[in-house]
């Protein structure tokens, strides 16, 4: 190696106590935050996706498949009217 960039070696980083003190707090915190974001239903509201019990309503029980190649717009309009 001709020069040094001044960065610490990866082995030095992962064997340091400071690294594990910081990451033993942040990694579980991120996991808990993500789990609560999904389990409370906030993820459905933020991203606008339907909740698991909203995929199939009483009036619409079939799977919305587009089967025709040339009449796909009509099938899509038909499907969107059922909302």
From Swiss-Prot:
Cofactor(s) listed in the protein's UniProt record: heme b
Predominant cellular place of this UniProt entry's protein: plastid
Binding-site residues for heme, renumbered to this chain: 23
Subcellular location: Plastid, Chloroplast thylakoid membrane
GO molecular function annotations of the record: electron transfer activity; heme binding; iron ion binding
Phosphoprotein as UniProt keyword: no
InterPro entries given in the database record: PSII_cyt_b559_asu (IPR006217), PSII_cyt_b559_asu_sf (IPR037025), PSII_cyt_b559_CS (IPR006216), PSII_cyt_b559_N (IPR013081), PSII_cytb559_asu_lum (IPR013082)
Free-text remark on how the cofactor is bound: With its partner (PsbF) binds heme. PSII binds additional chlorophylls, carotenoids and specific lipids.
GO CC annotations, alphabetized: chloroplast thylakoid membrane; photosystem II reaction center
SUPFAM superfamilies: Cytochrome b559 subunits
Spans traversing the lipid bilayer: 21-35
GO BP: any one term: photosynthetic electron transport chain
Assembly and interaction partners: Heterodimer of an alpha subunit and a beta subunit. PSII is composed of 1 copy each of membrane proteins PsbA, PsbB, PsbC, PsbD, PsbE, PsbF, PsbH, PsbI, PsbJ, PsbK, PsbL, PsbM, PsbT, PsbX, PsbY, PsbZ, Psb30/Ycf12, at least 3 peripheral proteins of the oxygen-evolving complex and a large number of cofactors. It forms dimeric complexes.
Family of the protein in this entry: Belongs to the PsbE/PsbF family.
Stated name of the protein: Cytochrome b559 subunit alpha
């Amino acid at each position: 190696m001709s020069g040094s960039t001044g960065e610490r070696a990866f082995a030095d980083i992962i064997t340091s106590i400071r690294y594990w003190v910081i990451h033993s707090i942040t990694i579980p915190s991120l996991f808990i935050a993500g789990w609560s974001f999904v389990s409370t239903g906030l993820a459905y509201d933020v991203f606008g996706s339907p909740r698991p019990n909203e995929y199939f309503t009483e009036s619409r029980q079939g799977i919305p498949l587009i089967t025709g190649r040339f009449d796909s717009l009509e099938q899509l309009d038909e499907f969107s009217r059922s909302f």
